[in-house]
């Protein structure tokens, strides 16, 4: 759409150019001596108002001056060509034909005038004026021939240089960047570099019939040339491109045939539109790209059109004419681009077609379920690709890559994990020890191993892990060796707490049920108690080589085991005493129950026993005496396993965190079994009967980790050992010795030199036994409380490593006789002696290579199911009574021999001649040592030795110390104690025993003097080794 408006200025227009899109500048006049004024006018253009063109600013020139002939405008600077009047030129001799104006603050201002030609001819005027777009340079040319083009500075109105053309120049124009200047003559075209002033391009080979009329730059490289024909009508347009001084013709076209001459031409700053006027006063709008006519306005003016100009925005085109009018046209973008209606219609139709195609495809997909089929195909292809083309990062990172494709709905995600996969290295040789501890004690430390397992790897390796734990569980149940023989064990404590009920993620270790194979029946133990859920344990790391450790830590606190006796009523206690004759066999199982391990300290600390320990010994002695005076009924022959299943039960154990465990591969925790009160009484009873038959010294000290077992009244909690000494139990059954042989033996003793003294001692012993039996029930009830209180005392290791200290550990352990009667001393003094054992056989826990002081109990043949029990008493004596007690022990030994023979004779009257095997059982986690001496062999030896005379009793001891044929090494065979086998007299035996006791007492006295400042005490510790009969 094109809108036009006409405005009558009142003077002929010779120059016109836009200052801006809304401001049009025109100039003209009547000339010298004419009543028509010469003016410079600024017109405001606004098609929104009724009056589109309005005279906005105007300057009237001197009436004596000539009319303006041309205008050049850029950046609000105005150069106008206008000659002065004839009179003024004649009088001054100068013609200031170039005048400068500026448009500032919406006002036109005159700046000055200059004469570049130096001509005084009033007929010579300024024909051409052109300014660069940026207003930095301008070019002017006069009507004088040949034409000289002057390059001037429009700011200070100075001339830079001149271009001699030698011809009549018809038109000039600057490129948009102001670097090139093109001008044409009637037959030639030339391009000049404004910077250097040199000619870049010249074209003179045009057709002779061509008449060049106008030239304008489209952009910095292209320009358009308008030409006519000399002898015929027609107008042609040609576009050129200048590249590297070699111009090329882009296009050329004859646009009009009827018009002969072009009067004016201009190109919009955007390079899209060409506006030209013809000799018939018409305006044509043409496309620069196609050189076709967009719009033709015929007969716009009544007279010749002198100027045509396009606004900077390209939306207005203005024409000026000598008819004193100005026409202005508003051109829409549709007009400049041709008919846009068809283009819009075509664009609309194309969009409709695209939409129709999309709708058709969507309908087909829905009808034939193609979207689901496409989804399935894509899923399969992605899965194949994930398998066939693994991640390229595998080779770069060098890691095990696990890829998984997850397709949920419309989302497809690929997860790549580069964590190392779970391998068997978790259970490698370096981690065997750790794994073995974890088998039985699944602590939270397992979480640290499990946290490194990725879920995808765990799912692949869960089966192998479960097989590993199955093997571990089988090893635990089969009680296989973990720490091999002669292996060294160095301990490093590490506290670990765990919950058995905890679930360890992502792999939970297989729970190991603590099932009891042979529960021991007890009237005072509640077998329904469950295993405590919280089991804090002290773990120890095993390493090193096995050897005897002579030095002991200087500051090592040990917890003392609490007593075995609980609170029992008198009726229950009587029942327990009756059942004391029945031997108790305790089968050790790694999963279900544990062994009592005796804990013994050094002899120096053993001597410092409090009065409470003495009272406990008195109570134990009373029980022993009562058991001797009132032996239990005979028990029918049956196997040890049947008796255990029938009569005993065991509590489940809760291990306290305050004790340290001797760690085996299965991680077995020791437990306290049975009714401690009943076992304690029956143990004391059997020891008294056995000691009255013979005294055996087992002098082997094999130190292991101390096992302090603490049992509360409900038997539900136990503390595992910290520094334990293992008891090795030996027993001899003299079951086939009849009463006749014992009577002969008694008569032989009575005929000795001390016959009268022995008879008196025997009578006194019988009386004391009757008295003690009445007190046994009352003393037993208080024993447990006293022993509990005394167990809180902590025991310290002797700081001295002198030979005396080492000797004291292997010397005889004695009771404190300061608070018991002479007869009681006689009985107690006949306790087991000490002998040395090889450490490899005596070691229950290879982690400890110290010697262990043990007792050997002789089991009476009446107690066919009696258990091998050990009661070790480390008792110290005061300095004030030590020497007197030594003499009492020596004198009492003779009394024991006579009294024990009498008691054994009485107790064997109603006994069945049962054959009971005696075993000395040393059970290690790594190996099991059994010393099994046949009861029948002992019976035959006993018949031969006791049938002749009394002195042969010594041979029974020698037979016991002889190594059985089926054993490679016996702990008794290495005894360092000398037994008198040649003397037929029991007096000589007694004297030898007294001498040994005195020597031990002297050594103990020396140690006591050295460590007289010690004030720590320790109670008697009672532990029982779980041996199998």
Curated annotation (Swiss-Prot):
Gene3D superfamilies: YVTN repeat-like/Quinoprotein amine dehydrogenase (2.130.10.10)
Topological region Lumenal: 366-1029
Biased composition (Basic and acidic residues): 613-628, 643-654, 712-722, 783-799
Region annotation (Disordered) ranges: 579-673, 710-732, 747-821, 858-886, 963-982, 1003-1029
Protein's membrane topology: Single-pass type II membrane protein
Membrane side Cytoplasmic: residue ranges: 1-344
Keyword Transport part of the UniProt annotation: yes
Biased segments, Polar residues type: 593-603, 633-642, 750-762, 771-782, 868-886
Low complexity bias: start-end ranges: 579-592, 655-672, 800-812, 858-867
Domain of life, per lineage: Eukaryota
Localization terms from the record: Endoplasmic reticulum membrane; Golgi apparatus membrane
Keywords assigned by UniProt, alphabetized: Endoplasmic reticulum, ER-Golgi transport, Glycoprotein, Golgi apparatus, GTPase activation, Membrane, Protein transport, Repeat, Signal-anchor, Transmembrane, Transmembrane helix, Transport, WD repeat
GO MF annotation terms: GTPase activator activity; guanyl-nucleotide exchange factor activity
GO biological process entries: endoplasmic reticulum to Golgi vesicle-mediated transport; protein transport; regulation of COPII vesicle coating
Glycosylation sites: 579, 608, 634, 647, 714, 754, 774, 792, 806, 855, 865, 874, 884, 966
InterPro entries: Sec12-like, WD40/YVTN_repeat-like_dom_sf, WD40_repeat_dom_sf, WD40_rpt
Cellular component GO terms, alphabetical: endoplasmic reticulum membrane; Golgi membrane
Chief place of localization: endoplasmic reticulum
Transmembrane segments: 345-365
WD repeat windows: 257-296, 300-339
Position of sequence motif Prevents secretion from ER: 1026-1029
Family: Belongs to the WD repeat SEC12 family.
Functional note: Putative guanine nucleotide-exchange factor (GEF) involved in the formation or budding of transport vesicles from the ER. Positive regulator of SAR1 probably through inhibition of the GTPase activation by SEC23.
Name the UniProt record assigns to this protein: Putative guanine nucleotide-exchange factor SED4
Taxonomic source organism: Candida glabrata (strain ATCC 2001 / BCRC 20586 / JCM 3761 / NBRC 0622 / NRRL Y-65 / CBS 138) (Yeast)
The gene coding this protein: SED4
């Amino acid at each position: 759409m094109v809108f036009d408006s006409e405005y009558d200025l009142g003077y002929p227009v010779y120059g016109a150019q836009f200052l801006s899109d809304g401001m049009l500048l025109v100039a003209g006049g009547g000339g010298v001596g004419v009543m028509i004024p010469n003016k410079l006018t600024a017109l405001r253009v606004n098609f929104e108002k009724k009056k589109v063109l309005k005279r906005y600013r105007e300057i009237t020139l001197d009436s004596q001056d000539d009319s303006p002939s041309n205008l050049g405008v850029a950046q609000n600077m105005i150069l106008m060509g206008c000659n002065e009047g004839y009179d003024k030129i004649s009088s001054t001799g100068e013609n200031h034909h170039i005048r400068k104006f500026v448009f500032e603050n919406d006002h036109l201002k005159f700046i000055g005038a200059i004469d570049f030609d130096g001509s005084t001819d009033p007929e010579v005027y300024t024909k051409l004026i052109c300014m660069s777009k940026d207003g930095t340079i301008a070019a002017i040319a006069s009507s004088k021939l040949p034409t000289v083009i002057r390059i001037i500075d429009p700011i200070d109105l100075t001339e830079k240089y001149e271009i001699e053309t030698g011809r009549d120049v018809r038109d000039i124009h600057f490129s948009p960047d102001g670097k090139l200047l093109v001008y044409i003559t009637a037959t030639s075209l030339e391009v000049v570099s404004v910077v250097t002033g040199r000619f870049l391009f010249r074209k003179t080979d045009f057709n002779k019939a061509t008449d060049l009329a106008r030239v304008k730059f489209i952009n910095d490289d292209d320009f358009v040339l308008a030409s006519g024909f000399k002898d015929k009508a027609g107008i042609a347009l040609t576009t050129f491109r200048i590249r590297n001084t070699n111009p090329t013709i882009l296009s050329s076209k004859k646009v009009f045939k009827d018009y002969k001459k072009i009067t004016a031409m201009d190109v919009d700053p955007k390079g899209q539109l060409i506006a030209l006027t013809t000799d018939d006063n018409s305006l044509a709008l043409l496309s620069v790209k196609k050189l076709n006519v967009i719009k033709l306005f015929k007969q716009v003016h009544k007279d010749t059109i002198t100027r045509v100009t396009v606004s900077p925005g390209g939306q207005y085109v203005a024409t000026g004419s000598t008819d004193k009018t100005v026409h202005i046209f508003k051109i829409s973008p549709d007009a400049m681009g041709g008919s846009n209606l068809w283009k819009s219609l075509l664009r609309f139709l194309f969009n409709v077609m695209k939409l129709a195609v999309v709708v058709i495809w969507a309908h087909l997909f829905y009808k034939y379920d193609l979207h689901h089929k496409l989804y399935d195909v894509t899923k399969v292809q992605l899965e194949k690709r994930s398998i066939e083309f693994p991640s390229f990062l595998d080779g770069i990172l060098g890691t095990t890559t696990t890829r998984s494709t997850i397709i949920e709905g419309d989302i497809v995600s690929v997860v790549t994990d580069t964590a190392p996969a779970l391998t068997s290295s978790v259970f490698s040789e370096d981690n065997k020890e750790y794994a073995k501890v974890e088998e039985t004690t699944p602590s939270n430390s397992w979480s640290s191993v499990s946290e490194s397992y990725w879920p995808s790897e765990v799912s692949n390796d869960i089966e192998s892990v479960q097989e590993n734990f199955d093997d571990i569980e089988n090893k635990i149940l089969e009680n296989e060796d973990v720490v091999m023989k002669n292996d060294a064990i160095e301990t490093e404590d590490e506290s670990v707490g765990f919950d058995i009920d905890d679930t360890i993620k992502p792999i939970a270790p297989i729970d190991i049920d603590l099932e009891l194979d042979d529960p021991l029946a007890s009237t005072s133990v509640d077998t329904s108690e469950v295993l405590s859920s919280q089991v804090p344990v002290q773990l120890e790391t095993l390493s090193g080589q096995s050897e005897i450790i002579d030095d002991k830590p200087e500051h090592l606190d040990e917890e003392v085991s609490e007593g075995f006796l609980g609170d029992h009523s008198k009726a229950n206690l009587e029942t327990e005493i009756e059942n004391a004759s029945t031997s108790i066999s305790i089968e050790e199982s790694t999963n279900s129950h544990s062994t009592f391990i005796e804990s013994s300290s050094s002899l120096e600390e053993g001597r410092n026993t409090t009065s409470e320990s003495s009272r406990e010994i008195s109570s134990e002695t009373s029980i022993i005496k009562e058991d001797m005076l009132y032996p239990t009924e005979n028990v029918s022959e049956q196997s040890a396993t049947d008796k255990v299943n029938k009569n005993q039960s065991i509590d489940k154990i809760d291990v306290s965190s305050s004790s340290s465990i001797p760690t085996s591969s299965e991680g077995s925790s020791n437990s306290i079994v049975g009714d401690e009160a009943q076992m304690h009484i029956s143990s004391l009873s059997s020891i008294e009967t056995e000691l009255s038959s013979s005294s055996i010294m087992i002098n082997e000290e094999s130190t292991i980790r101390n096992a302090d077992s603490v049992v509360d009244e409900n038997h539900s909690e136990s503390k595992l050992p910290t520094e334990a000494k293992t008891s090795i139990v030996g027993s001899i059954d003299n079951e086939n010795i009849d009463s006749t042989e014992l009577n002969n033996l008694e008569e032989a003793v009575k005929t000795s030199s001390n016959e009268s003294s022995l008879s008196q001692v025997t009578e006194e012993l019988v009386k004391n036994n009757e008295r003690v039996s009445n007190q046994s029930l009352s003393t037993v009830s208080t024993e447990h409380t006293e022993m509990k209180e005394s167990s809180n005392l902590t025991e310290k290791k002797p700081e001295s490593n002198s030979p005396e200290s080492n000797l004291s550990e292997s010397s005889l352990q004695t009771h404190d006789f300061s608070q018991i009667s002479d007869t009681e001393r006689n009985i107690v003094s006949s306790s087991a002696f000490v002998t040395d054992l090889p450490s490899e056989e005596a070691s229950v826990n290879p982690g400890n290579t110290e010697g262990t002081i043990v007792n050997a109990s002789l089991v009476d043949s009446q107690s066919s199911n009696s258990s091998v029990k050990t009661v070790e008493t480390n008792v110290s004596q005061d300095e004030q009574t030590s020497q007197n007690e030594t003499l009492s022990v020596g004198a009492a030994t003779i009394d024991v021999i006579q009294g024990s023979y009498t008691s054994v004779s009485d107790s064997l009257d109603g006994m069945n001649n049962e054959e009971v095997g005696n075993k000395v059982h040393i059970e290690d986690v790594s190996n099991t040592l059994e010393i099994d001496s046949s009861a029948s062999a002992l019976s035959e030896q006993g018949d031969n030795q006791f049938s002749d005379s009394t002195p042969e009793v010594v041979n029974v001891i020698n037979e016991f110390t002889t190594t059985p044929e089926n054993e490679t090494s016996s702990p008794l065979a290495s005894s360092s104690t000398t037994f008198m086998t040649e003397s037929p007299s029991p007096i000589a035996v007694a004297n030898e025993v007294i001498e040994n006791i005195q020597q031990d007492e002297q050594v103990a006295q020396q140690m006591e003097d050295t460590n007289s400042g010690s004030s720590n005490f320790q109670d008697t510790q009672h532990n029982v080794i779980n041996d199998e009969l």
